[in-house]
C-alpha cells in the first residue's frame, strides 16, 4: 500500500509515514491471526485467490471455531485443496491454538509425512513467527 501525504517538509512526513506503516503491519498481522485467508496472504504473498478459496477459508474458520465438526471438500485437482487443507490450515490452526494437536493423514504415508514437514518448516520460519510470535 502506498499513500501520499502532503504536510510540509520531509522531517514532518517521515514520522507520520513510519507510524502509518507500523499500523498497516499491525492490522495485517491481526488479520493473519484471525482469518485463514489473511494468514494465507501473509505467508504466501504471491497467491492469487479465487472465489472457491474464500469459500474454503470460511469453512476452515468454522471448523477451527468448533462450529463444524466435519468437512468434506470435493473439487477438481490442482485447485489448492491439499495446500490449504494439509499445509496451510494446520499451520494456521497451530498458531491460533498451540495447545491442540493435529493428525496429518493422506492416502500414502509419504504424502502425509511431506505435508507434515512443510507444516513444521513453516511454523519454524521467520515469516510465521512474525504472525504468531509465541
Where are the regions a protein language model picked out?
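Phosphate/NTP-binding elements of NTP-utilizing enzymes
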Residues: 2-134
Amino acid at each position: 500500500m502506498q499513500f501520499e501525504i502532503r504536510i510540509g517538509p520531509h522531517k514532518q512526513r517521515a514520522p507520520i509515514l513510519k507510524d502509518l506503516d507500523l499500523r498497516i503491519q499491525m492490522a495485517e498481522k491481526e488479520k493473519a491471526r484471525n482469518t485463514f485467508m489473511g494468514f494465507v496472504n501473509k505467508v504466501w504473498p504471491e497467491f492469487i485467490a479465487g472465489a472457491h478459496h474464500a469459500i474454503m477459508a470460511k469453512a476452515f474458520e468454522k471448523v477451527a471455531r468448533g462450529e463444524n465438526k466435519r468437512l468434506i471438500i470435493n473439487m477438481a485437482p490442482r485447485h489448492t485443496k491439499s495446500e490449504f487443507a494439509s499445509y496451510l490450515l494446520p499451520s494456521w490452526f497451530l498458531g491460533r491454538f498451540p495447545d491442540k494437536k493435529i493428525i496429518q493423514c493422506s492416502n500414502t504415508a509419504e504424502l502425509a509425512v511431506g505435508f507434515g514437514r512443510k507444516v513444521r518448516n513453516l511454523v519454524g520460519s521467520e515469516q510465521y513467527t512474525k504472525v504468531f510470535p509465541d
